Design a protein with these regions (language model features):
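A short beta-to-alpha transition loop/helix N-cap that caps and shapes the active-site region
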Residues: 104, 114-120
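Short acidic/proline- and small/hydrophobic-mixed sequence motifs that coincide with surface turns
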Residues: 34, 103-104
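A short, N-terminal "cap"/entry segment at the start of jelly-roll beta-barrel domains
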Residues: 1-37, 51-52, 118-151
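Short, conserved beta-strand element in jelly-roll/cupin
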Residues: 36, 41-46, 55-71, 109-111
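Short acidic-glycine-tyrosine-enriched beta hairpin
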Residues: 75-90
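Structural motif
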Residues: 48, 61, 68-70, 77, ...
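Short beta-strand His + acidic residue motifs that chelate non-heme Fe in jelly-roll/DSBH
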Residues: 51-53, 71-72, 88, 94-100, ...
């Protein structure tokens, strides 16, 4: 099997309404495909770019490369900064918000591989809303992005 290389500089990725861009490094439209995990690079815009409150069947890790943000996981809320990683168990609601003045950059890895519903839900404006269709966010957390996509 020949070596396959994914070059972040050539992967366009997708921009989401919650002010982030996701570039698949393994899975999705990446030249690298795996059956046991997916991995990608995410840039959250300053002052509120977000991976909104959601859950998924896969276990996942976020590794923060640069920036500062708020990580919510179940009933917990914490500040997270570059150089830190957080484990996200399957089916646990979670949210990451950039609270800094510069872009936050992170890598996610989850398994098994496959698309996750929250990507489509966010693009369609159908994400379950915290406290209504989903558990409430931890006390004091940044609000969940629920604005519909701009047409």
């Amino acid at each position: 099997m020949p070596m396959t290389i994914a070059d972040l500089r050539t992967i366009t990725g997708r921009t989401y309404p919650a002010r982030r861009r996701t570039q698949n490094l393994v899975g999705g439209l990446s030249p690298i495909q795996a059956s046991n995990f997916s991995m990608g690079f995410v840039t959250l815009e300053p002052h509120g770019g977000q991976v909104p409150w959601h859950n998924q069947e896969q276990e996942e890790v976020y590794f923060i490369l640069e920036g500062k943000g708020e990580m919510c996981l179940g009933a917990e809320r914490s500040t997270i900064v570059g150089g830190q990683a957080v484990f996200i168990p399957p089916r646990v609601f979670h949210q990451l918000t950039n609270t800094g003045a510069t872009p936050m950059k992170m890598i996610y890895c989850y398994g098994p591989a496959g698309d996750v519903a929250h990507w489509r839900q966010e693009l369609e404006g159908t994400l379950p809303r915290a406290g209504t269709d989903a558990p409430t966010l931890p006390e004091g957390a940044q609000p969940q992005w629920t604005e519909p996509p701009q047409s």
